[in-house]
């Protein structure tokens, strides 16, 4: 039997724990049976099966963004939002909510389990290279990422790593794992595969397939970050950066920004700000889930219609930036430097009362635009979120990995290293001047020494320098929207001579800066709720998440938002979804 038939198979429908076989898997009378000894041994078989798994991932695209963003503090739902979207935002996600469907996750997982069980990884080509190792590793990464999403959203989930193909297997009872159990299992599962290259399937439709995989080193970083293995997480993220374009290559933050052209505050220059989907050594998008091109195909992403006015949504959006995000953006201090003056330039802080979101960080102004529109002689309020102008769903982006590297380094005990990622950008010269002098033990110096960001006059990680006209590709992430952060007197490494535990104080304050930067840089991208959750869990302080979500409509409207949500978010059990009492806490 050819593996292409597996595309019709959500492999014999089954539930995993304590319930009938219809709870997590749909019955499908057209499924194809296969023999227990069937193996994937032909290239065509493995390609069909791999693209079949990609197809199943499409069902998870929109909800990955929505569950991660609507429950955070950076967006609000409008009166035009559906009951399902409103339910997510209000933490009132019922069993019949369209985005509460564990079976879609298990459809991916069971297809992955089948592939892993049946793929013959011993087959070699005439060059004695293992023929299917790349596909095998990619499928293991798909499975790990999907289980991580399940655990983040449901808390405790049925855990199965073998394909369910019979009624007897369907009716068996299986163990459950929580987030920590999921992380530990897949850290062990993926670590041996960290240096396996991604498959080379070329272009699928109009999409470069190299953007459709989850890099194992990055995924290991996420798993270790959630597990609290901060040094290893930092090394994993660095491993991704150092090998993103092949061994011993470079993957810098890039020279991307939106900035005031002058201190007149009325014109801008914009460089490389769009997350286009082309594949290059300087690509912005690292991983995405491909969406269908037309609605009738079944996995057509609606995100563009949720965030942008269009004919398809009758010019009415469902999601808009929250007052909390607007206030955070406005509260930043934009630092202008006249680069034409070189070393003679001095910092000028932009006024705090500029109109049209021009005060503070400029990324929100660039990303979110509103205005008046007219169609057929009728007025409507126009909104555009330019992060959603594609049918594909962006999961990992380049700046995101640097922010997670900063988060891991900070919690590993290296807040100065983390701070430089935000403020200046890092290369070996920056590490030598601003990080290594504060490593007071040989062990700390040795750890930092494992990170190398080399540069020459025109290659490697070239940090911008106001005294030089040379091209650069590395800058502090805060500078993407807030000007010359490295010269900003309001953006300094936190110190307090009155604090006895200086390192703990610095780590918490730098973590606050990182979380603010996550909001400014990654807003609308589906990561915010999980960022808040991660910090709240590691600080053992559920109120860290709760007070921010309750304040998303502004500090003056906290009581109103609490009444709308009607869930005590200081109780972590209320952060998670459940489904028919069969999954969840």
Give names to the regions the model predicted.
Residues 246-432, 443-447, 511, 522, ...:
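Elongated scaffold/linker segments in the mid-to-C-terminal portions of large proteins
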Residues 1-31:
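Bacterial Sec-dependent N-terminal signal peptides
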Residues 151-158, 226-229, 413:
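Short coil/turn linking the two alpha-helices of tandem helical-hairpin repeats
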Residues 21-70, 544, 552-585:
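Membrane-proximal, proline-rich intrinsically disordered regions
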Residues 179-182, 196-204, 248-276, 348, ...:
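Surface-exposed intrinsically disordered loops and tails
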Residues 47-48, 82-154, 174-181, 191-203, ...:
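Conserved, well-structured interaction surfaces
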């Amino acid at each position: 039997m050819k593996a292409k038939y597996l595309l019709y198979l959500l492999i014999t429908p089954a539930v995993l724990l304590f319930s009938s076989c219809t709870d997590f898997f749909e019955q499908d009378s057209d499924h194809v049976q296969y023999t227990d000894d069937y193996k994937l041994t032909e290239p065509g078989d493995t390609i069909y099966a791999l693209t079949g798994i990609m197809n199943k991932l499409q069902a998870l695209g929109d909800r990955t963004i929505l569950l991660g963003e609507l429950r955070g503090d950076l967006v609000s739902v409008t009166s035009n939002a559906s009951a399902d979207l409103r339910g997510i935002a209000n933490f009132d996600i019922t069993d019949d909510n369209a985005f509460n469907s564990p079976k879609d996750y298990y459809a991916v997982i069971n297809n992955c389990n089948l592939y892993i069980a049946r793929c013959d990884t011993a087959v070699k080509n005439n060059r004695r290279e293992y023929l299917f190792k790349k596909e095998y590793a990619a499928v293991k990464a798909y499975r790990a990422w999907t289980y991580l999403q399940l655990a983040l959203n449901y808390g405790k989930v049925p855990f199965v790593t073998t394909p369910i193909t019979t009624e007897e297997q369907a009716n068996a009872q299986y163990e459950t794992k929580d987030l920590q159990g999921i992380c530990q299992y897949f850290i062990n599962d993926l670590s041996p595969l960290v240096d396996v290259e991604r498959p080379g399937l070329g272009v699928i439709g109009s999409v470069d397939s190299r953007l459709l995989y989850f890099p194992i080193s990055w995924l290991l970083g996420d798993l270790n970050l959630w597990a609290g293995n901060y040094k290893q997480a930092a090394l994993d993220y660095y491993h991704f950066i150092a090998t993103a374009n092949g061994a011993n290559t470079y993957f810098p933050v890039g020279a991307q920004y939106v900035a005031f052209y002058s201190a007149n505050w009325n014109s801008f220059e914009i460089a490389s700000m769009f997350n286009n989907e082309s594949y290059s050594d300087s690509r912005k998008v690292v991983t995405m889930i491909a969406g269908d091109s037309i609605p009738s195909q079944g996995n057509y992403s609606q995100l563009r219609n949720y965030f942008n006015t269009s004919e398809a949504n009758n010019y009415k959006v469902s999601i808009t930036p929250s007052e909390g995000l607007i206030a955070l953006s406005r509260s930043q201090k934009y630092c202008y430097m006249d680069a034409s003056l070189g070393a003679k330039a001095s910092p000028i802080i932009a006024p705090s009362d500029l109109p049209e979101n021009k005060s503070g960080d400029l990324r929100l102004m660039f990303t979110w635009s509103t205005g008046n529109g007219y169609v057929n002689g009728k007025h409507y309020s126009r909104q555009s979120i330019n992060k959603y102008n594609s049918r594909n769903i962006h999961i990992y982006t380049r700046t995101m990995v640097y922010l997670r590297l900063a988060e891991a380094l900070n919690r590993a005990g290296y807040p100065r290293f983390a701070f430089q990622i935000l403020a200046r950008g890092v290369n070996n010269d920056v590490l030598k001047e601003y990080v290594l002098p504060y490593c007071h033990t040989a062990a700390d110096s040795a750890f930092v020494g494992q990170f190398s960001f080399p540069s020459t006059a025109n290659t490697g990680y070239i940090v911008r320098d106001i005294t030089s006209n040379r091209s650069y590709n590395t800058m502090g992430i805060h500078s993407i929207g807030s000007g010359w952060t490295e010269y900003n007197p309001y953006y300094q490494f936190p110190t307090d001579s009155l604090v006895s535990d200086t390192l703990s104080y610095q780590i918490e304050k730098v973590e606050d800066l990182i979380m603010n930067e996550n909001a400014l840089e990654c807003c609308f991208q589906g990561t915010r709720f999980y960022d808040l959750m991660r910090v709240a869990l590691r600080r053992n302080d559920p109120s860290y998440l709760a007070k921010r979500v309750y304040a998303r409509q502004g500090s003056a409207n906290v009581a109103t938002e609490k009444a709308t949500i009607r869930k005590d978010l200081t109780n972590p059990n209320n952060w998670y979804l459940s489904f028919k009492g069969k999954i969840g806490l």
